[in-house]
């Protein structure tokens, strides 16, 4: 299968740079699958998972807090405020943050911004999915 260069960058650092066979991400208008030779594209992506298939066929998962995905001939770039490799996520911390977010929604006061609280919960759920998918991929390698 053909490969292309992918770079995933957060506000703090470069998370990934290398050759991949494909990537999957969630755009604002739905799921995206990018292969070599894809039509040029610039789109916003939602908080969630960017799944990479490396040139050796192995898969890797990266959590992104949202951002942009740009496709150019033979080069794809993902720009995100926050990006964390799945194997760097801490399941216990994610579950604790998810629980706090749920509690904040349940007990919110009149001045609390529901959309902000729901967004925080959504991001924690996306991190949890990235963590669980990474754990599943690691388990399947054994």
Swiss-Prot record:
GO MF entries: ATP binding; proton-transporting ATP synthase activity, rotational mechanism
GO cellular component: plasma membrane; proton-transporting ATP synthase complex
Biological classification of the source: Bacteria, Pseudomonadati, Pseudomonadota, Gammaproteobacteria, Pasteurellales
Designated name of the protein: ATP synthase epsilon chain
Localization of this protein: Cell inner membrane
Principal subcellular localisation of the protein: membrane
Gene3D superfamilies the UniProt entry points to: ATP synthase delta/epsilon subunit, C-terminal domain, F0F1 ATP synthase delta/epsilon subunit, N-terminal
Cited HAMAP family: ATP_synth_epsil_bac
Role, per record: Produces ATP from ADP in the presence of a proton gradient across the membrane.
Alphabetic keyword roster: ATP synthesis, Cell inner membrane, Cell membrane, CF(1), Hydrogen ion transport, Ion transport, Membrane, Transport
Similarity remark: Belongs to the ATPase epsilon chain family.
One Pfam family per UniProt: ATP-synt_DE_N
Membrane topology (UniProt): Peripheral membrane protein
Assembly and binders: F-type ATPases have 2 components, CF(1) - the catalytic core - and CF(0) - the membrane proton channel. CF(1) has five subunits: alpha(3), beta(3), gamma(1), delta(1), epsilon(1). CF(0) has three main subunits: a, b and c.
Source organism of the structure: Pasteurella multocida (strain Pm70)
InterPro entries in the cross-refs: ATP_F1_dsu/esu_C_sf (IPR036794), ATP_synth_F1_dsu/esu (IPR001469), ATP_synth_F1_dsu/esu_N (IPR020546), ATPsynth_dsu/esu_N (IPR036771)
Highest taxon listed in the record's lineage: Bacteria
